[in-house]
């Protein structure tokens, strides 16, 4: 007799068992950052911030970065197929008093195009 093994019981929903998109991005960024910090420490480069190390990892040290909304306000649009670079934002305190670093989704100048003036 075959037994049907259900991974979820009736009180567990899909969202409780799989991380949200933001949780995935946070885990991904944390993993990259931890690796970069370990490599920087081993190389004696301890004065660099996480975001400076990420810029080096992305090979965009001197690039100009802005959010989608900021580029839009400047009259530019993100080119089709471009994906945002992940960076850590400034520390924020939630309504419950929890302090955390938000994720910033930034695009560099090479990823945008300014609208043509007619």
Feature map (PLM): residue ranges:
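N-terminal accessory/interface modules of nucleic-acid-binding and processing proteins
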Residues: 2-118
């Amino acid at each position: 007799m075959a037994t049907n093994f259900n991974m979820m019981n009736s009180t567990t929903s899909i969202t409780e068992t799989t991380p949200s998109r933001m949780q995935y991005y946070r885990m991904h960024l944390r993993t990259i950052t931890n690796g970069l910090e370990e490599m920087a420490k081993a190389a004696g480069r301890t004065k660099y911030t996480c975001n400076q190390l990420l810029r080096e990892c992305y090979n965009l040290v001197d690039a100009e970065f802005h959010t989608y909304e900021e580029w839009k306000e400047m009259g530019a649009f993100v080119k089709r197929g471009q994906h945002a670079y992940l960076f850590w934002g400034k520390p924020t305190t939630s309504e419950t008093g929890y302090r955390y670093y938000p994720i910033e989704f930034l695009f560099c100048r090479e990823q945008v195009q300014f609208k043509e003036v007619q």
